[in-house]
Every structure is written in C-alpha cells, then in structure tokens.
C-alpha cells in the first residue's frame, strides 16, 4: 500500500498516467489474491494457528477463532483501502484520504457500539471490516474519478529505444 504513494507520484510527475492505472490494477490483483488465500488459511487452520500461542484455554481459542474468521475474511477490503489511500496521496490529494480516515474511525466506533450489543463479541469483531468498508467507499470513488480526470492529460512520452 505505502509504496503506491511513491509509485503514483513518480509516474504522475513523469506524465505516465496509464502506468499508474496499470500498477494499481496489478497491485490490487496481487493484494486481493493474497488476502483471499490468507483469509481461507485463517478460516481453515485458524484453530491450529491460535494453538501455537494459546494452550489450555478453549474459550480464548474460540474467541480468537471468531476474530480471525470475521477479520481474515475481509482483509481484501483492507488491502484495497491501503492501495487507494496511498495512491491518492501520491497524486497530491489529501482531503479524501483524511476524510476516509475519519470515516473509518466513526464507522468502527458506531459498529462496535451497535453490533456488540446485538451480537456480542462477534459483533465487536465486525467493527473492523465495516470501518474498512466505510473508508474504502469514498477512497475508491475518489480514485476512479481521479483516474478519469487524469486520463485527459497528455499521453506518456515514448520511451527511447537504444
């Protein structure tokens, strides 16, 4: 995620907007793929992984498994959040990433307060993914609008062939 700020800034400065779009797509594909695989690993082997750190406390293992299942299943959203946030920052935008961060905190707090009362610990665990969604929505919209706006810039200069 964080490398996207430098990547986007360098390519923006070079006027190579298509490369920004291509890089974000490739980074998103890699990150989402890895996140989905790790989410599956968390769900299938979560109990075994937790057992490496917790022994003899079945209630701790059970609650940790709930946490891993809920959060691990949504890491792909978090990966997109980081990619969009840092790409926008690299393109010189600060308002939307800041607004998205505020939205993330508010959504997380609201979800924790409401859902914990309704669903207990599982509801509290849902606060993170819902906060990520609340932040990712404005970031993804801003990213798409920004890329559309930047597509009107002059095309990237041709690479000289030596």
Positions of PLM-derived features:
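Short membrane-interface helical motifs at transmembrane helix boundaries
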Residues: 37-58, 65
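Transmembrane-helix signature of multi-pass solute transporters
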Residues: 28, 33, 37-41, 107-111, ...
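Small-residue-rich hydrophobic transmembrane alpha-helices
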Residues: 1-40, 44-46, 78-92, 96-100
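Membrane-helix cytosolic exit motif
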Residues: 5, 13, 139-150
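Hydrophobic alpha-helical interface/terminus motif in multipass membrane transporters
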Residues: 8, 49-50, 88, 115, ...
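Membrane-interface helix-loop junctions in multi-pass transport and translocation proteins
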Residues: 48, 105-137, 147, 154-155
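Alpha-helical transmembrane segments of multi-pass membrane proteins
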Residues: 58-84
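Residue-level recognition of transmembrane alpha-helices
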Residues: 31, 68-71, 75, 101-102, ...
